[in-house]
């Protein structure tokens, strides 16, 4: 009998969703501290063209020190430059309008929209688009009309407004989020996190990647299936050709 064990990290704090449900709206300093960590982690993924596509408080975990862990990359996809995604995924309350409408979309822009919903929820304790039923909620998301409570600070209201833009091209990008006054306001809480988390990824050398496989027999089929979860639209044969290529 062959036994296989899956070793996972234990994250004591549980889901961010449960934390907000229990304690309600968070103080701005705490909400932004968590949001900065979410953006830092997501920005790192985006540097490698990996989009999460299912960001929501249920998929964000907190450790014993209340630091963020992004989880559940089951919907994640690789989006090379110039490539558009088309799979409809994510939770309706957090999905971007372009996904709801069935348009081709940029995964990074859709992720940023979801982050705006999360920031709103952290600061208010409720969601900006919640029509009580699925159909009404989807219509609200498509329109992109919502009200920002007056008790939010000007910085918070401005950042949320810049993120929750229905048209992706009008949506603030990751680097400008990081440089926004709300983020800079609480920079002292995580001084080690700064611009190295944002921007293009450094090129990987052949030495860092390891030598290419020499034949199809060297390709592990389980790993190939895992690669296909990121390259949704690429056939297995094409992936194998790329793995065998010396480039």
Task: For each feature predicted by the language model, list its residue ranges.
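Protein kinase catalytic-loop region centered on the HRD/HxD motif
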Residues: 38-50
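Conserved catalytic-loop aspartate of Hanks-type protein kinases
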Residues: 111
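Structural helix C-cap motif within protein kinase domains
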Residues: 124-127
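Activation segment signature within eukaryotic-like protein kinase domains
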Residues: 34-35
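Conserved short submotifs of the Hanks-type protein kinase catalytic core
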Residues: 2-15, 19
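A conserved short helix/loop substructure at the end of the activation segment
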Residues: 164-176
């Amino acid at each position: 009998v062959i036994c296989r064990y899956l070793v996972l990290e234990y994250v004591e704090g549980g889901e961010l969703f449960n934390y907000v449900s229990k304690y309600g709206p968070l103080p701005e300093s705490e909400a932004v501290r968590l949001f900065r960590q979410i953006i830092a982690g997501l920005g790192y993924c985006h540097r490698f063209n990996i989009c999460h596509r299912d960001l929501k408080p249920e998929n964000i975990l907190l450790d014993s020190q209340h630091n963020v862990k992004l989880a559940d990359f089951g919907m994640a996809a690789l989006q090379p430059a110039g490539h558009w995604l088309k799979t409809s995924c994510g939770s309706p309350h957090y999905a971007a309008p372009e996904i709801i409408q069935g348009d081709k979309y940029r995964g990074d822009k859709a992720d940023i929209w979801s982050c705006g919903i999360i920031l709103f929820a952290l600061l208010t304790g409720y969601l900006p688009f919640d029509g009580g039923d699925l159909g009404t909620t989807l219509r609200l998301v498509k329109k992109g009309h919502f009200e920002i409570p007056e008790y939010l600070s000007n910085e918070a209201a401005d950042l949320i407004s810049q993120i929750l833009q229905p048209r992706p091209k009008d949506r603030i990008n990751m680097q400008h989020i990081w440089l926004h006054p709300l983020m800079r306001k609480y920079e002292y809480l995580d001084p080690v996190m700064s611009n190295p988390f944002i921007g293009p990824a450094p090129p990987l050398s052949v030495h860092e990647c390891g030598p290419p496989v020499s034949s199809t027999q060297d390709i592990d089929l389980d790993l190939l299936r895992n690669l296909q979860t990121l390259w949704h639209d690429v056939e297995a044969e094409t992936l194998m050709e790329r793995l065998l290529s010396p480039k």
